């Protein structure tokens, strides 16, 4: 009976360790996904700015060119 208790305890202990490691990896993955989403949003905002600035420059240049 004692060996059965020891075996059961060992199985439960290893199961908890395994579960703990899996949960830690999930948390790290979620953090990485959050950082990746923020980086993608920042990249999209910068590319929108890059598309907008030449348009704005040509518009201002056109207005200044017509007044001269």
UniProtKB/Swiss-Prot annotation:
Residue numbers carrying Leucine amide: 64
Acidic residues compositional bias, start-end: 30-42
Entries under Pfam families matching the protein: FSAP_sig_propep
Cell compartment(s), UniProt: Secreted
Listed name of the protein: Preprofallaxidin-5
KW Signal (keyword) present: yes
InterPro entries associated with the record: Frog_antimicrobial_propeptide
TM annotation in the entry: none
Keyword Signal: yes
Leader peptide range in chain numbering: 1-22
GO terms under cellular component: extracellular region
Family: Belongs to the frog skin active peptide (FSAP) family. Brevinin subfamily.
Keywords: Amidation, Amphibian defense peptide, Secreted, Signal
Any single GO BP term: defense response
Superkingdom classification of source: Eukaryota
Prodomain residues: 23-51, 68
Tissue: Expressed by the skin glands.
Disordered: region residues: 24-50
